[in-house]
C-alpha cells in the first residue's frame, strides 16, 4: 500500500496488520495529513491544550536535590497537566481527528490507566462513546484510575488473557477495532503500533520539547546538556526528543525499566536487551523467547510494562543519536522518595525512572557542571498505594 508519509524509521515501523484494517489506517493518515495543514484544526487543538489541558506546563528548577553538586536539574512538569500526565496532549489531537473522520466511538488500551483517563476525558469533552481495554492485573493495581475512567462515562473492560497486562489489552483493543472501525477510532496510547500512529503521536506530543527548549533558553540562556525521559512505548520521550533531535549538542537519554534487574529476565528493556521482530503492527525490538514468542515484560510501573518500543526510538538507538539505559524498580523507588522528601513533588513511578538516571549522572560526577532536564511525565497519585505496600513490606513505614 502506498502511504502519504514514510511508514518507516530506518528499518523499523511499517504496517503489519490484517488487510481488513488497511482502509482504516489509510483514512487515519489522510485525516491527519489534511488536519496538519488546516489552520482551523490547529487552532482548535491549541485552544484545548491551553484552556482545557493547561499548557504550557511549568519548567521547575530543583532547589534541593542537587545540593553539593555542580548539576542544574530542571523538571518538565507534565504532571501538572489536566488528567495528571502527558497522555492528555495527544488524545485531544486524536479525539479531534476522530470527530473529523465522523467516528462516534473511541476504543483504547491502557496500562497505568493514564491513557485510559485521558481517553475518557477527551471522549466526555467531545461527546464520543469510549471503551477501554485494561489488563486485569493493571485494573487491580490502578483502581483509582479505573474509577476515574468510569466516572467520566467510559466502559472499562478487564483483559484476563495472556499476562493480563498492557500487551494483552493492546491485542484486545486491536481485535475490537478490526470489527468496528467504520464507526470507531482506535486511540492508541503510545508512539508505537502500525503507521501512522508513531508519527501522529509524536506530532501531538512534540510541544513538550518545543516548550522545554523555549523555557530553558529563557531561564539559562542555553540548551541543556541532556534531556532525559522514561521509555515504555515511548510517547513522552519522543515528545521531549523531537524538537532536540537536530540539536546535536543536546544528549537524548531514554530510560527503560530494568525491573528486578536485567540479569533476572524480569524487565521491560527491549531496546538494549531484546531482538527485532514484528508485533503490534510494527517491526521493532521486542522481548522474545528463544522460539520467537513475545515474552512477558515486567516493571514496578504499569505504564512501562510493555514488551516492545516505538520504532523511532529503535531508529534513534540504532544510529546512536539517542542513548538508552535501564533503571531498576529499586532505583526508581529511591528517586520517587527523594523527590517527595526534598522537592515536595510526588512523581509517577514511570517518571521516577528518568529522574533516577538523572540523579545517577549527578552523583557519579558531582564536580561536573551539567544542565539536565527530566521529563516528569506524570504525577504519582495513582502509585501511592503501590509504594505504600512495598515500603510497608520492607518495614520502612
From Swiss-Prot:
Organism: Escherichia coli O1:K1 / APEC
Modified residues (N6-(pyridoxal phosphate)lysine): 87
Single Gene Ontology MF annotation: tryptophan synthase activity
Pfam families on file: PALP
Pathway: Amino-acid biosynthesis; L-tryptophan biosynthesis; L-tryptophan from chorismate: step 5/5
Name of this protein: Tryptophan synthase beta chain
Role of this protein: The beta subunit is responsible for the synthesis of L-tryptophan from indole and L-serine.
Required cofactor(s): pyridoxal 5'-phosphate
Catalysis: reaction(s): (1S,2R)-1-C-(indol-3-yl)glycerol 3-phosphate + L-serine = D-glyceraldehyde 3-phosphate + L-tryptophan + H2O
Assembly notes: Tetramer of two alpha and two beta chains.
Listed EC numbers: 4.2.1.20
